[in-house]
Amino acid sequence: MSDEQEDFEEASDPDLLDDEGETEWVGEEEWGDEEEVPTFVDNGDGTISDTRSNLMWKKDDSFKEFGYGINWFEAQDYCEMLNEKKFAGYDDWRLPSGEEAKSAFSFTQSNSDKDGAETHISELFEPGGGHNTWTYEEKPDYQQYAQKFSFVTGNEMWEHKDNEYSYCRVTRDVIQEEWEPEWRKETKTFER
């Protein structure tokens, strides 16, 4: 067998082909190392806390509650409704910033949205929600637009506030002792 035939055989043999091609996601190189992956704790009350960002998230989103998409104004009303009800005992629920929404996202995490598509948020969040969230950030030069964050791609985008095909995942700031397990507090006591 000639060298050319041998090269052809090697190149066309499926056992010799590298079938572990890597999928490169847009923006994936910007996300950094594994230590930046969100670390979530299920609080057992319909909320999840991210110990890295000190944010508390509602486990489900507006789609799980209503069954349809909402516009930015309805997302604001949704936060207000949760605050009036004192959901999980708190009255300071709000839309996240773009950076806060991004902090819940990681390519190493996997969940599914309402259509069964993969989203990159912790499996501790309820599956079957929307694939994006409104943020509180308004476009500076054109206030009829607000920022959305995609949990599929990790991208931020500007969307008209009247767009009803978006969803809302709410958050709040937490002080560490609000959700820190009792056993952890005890282990932090040092004697001299």
Regions found by a protein language model. Name each.
Residues 71, 76-92, 98-148, 159:
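An exposed tryptophan-centered "aromatic clamp" motif
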Residues 48, 60-63, 96, 102-103, ...:
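Generic hydrophobic/packing signal
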Residues 10, 137, 141-183:
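Solvent-exposed, polar surface segments
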Residues 2-93, 165-171, 178-191:
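Extracellular adhesion/carbohydrate-recognition regions
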